[in-house]
């Protein structure tokens, strides 16, 4: 009797396993990646070009935006490897050329960013993450999680992290975003860790 019961339970468990696998497979959505006709873009050596990648569409033009968080920037040549974001046109670009985007931050390694904020851009890793608003004419978010506030450098170096909000045209004035900075506030949970905003990013609206 026990053997029959054990055999019945094993059969039931096997049927449940098959049903579970079937249900799991039935909800999986797949898509094809064209391995025979890839579009390949390249960037500077040792720049981590491709660390983050984002598709962007504006004014009937398709772009691939690429983060290279260890790149030297042609717009910030005085800053030590701040990182860069490149734009690569998908069509009408037979040479597969990518150009660095000017985020409008100038050529100074240090920048004033508030009443008690002095930003240090060396090795900030701009382009570590990229995000886009999920709508037509969506803006772009490009972040540098290793950006530091050194205003209190005798006591604290505060790795707040920095993001640039880029217009959908990929040109013109960008908007600075430093979520973890507040005037006259020396700590932002640094006794437990570092904020480093921008290691990932998303638009909620």
Question: Where are the regions that the model predicts?
Answer:
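Conserved beta-strand/short-helix segments
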Residues: 2-205
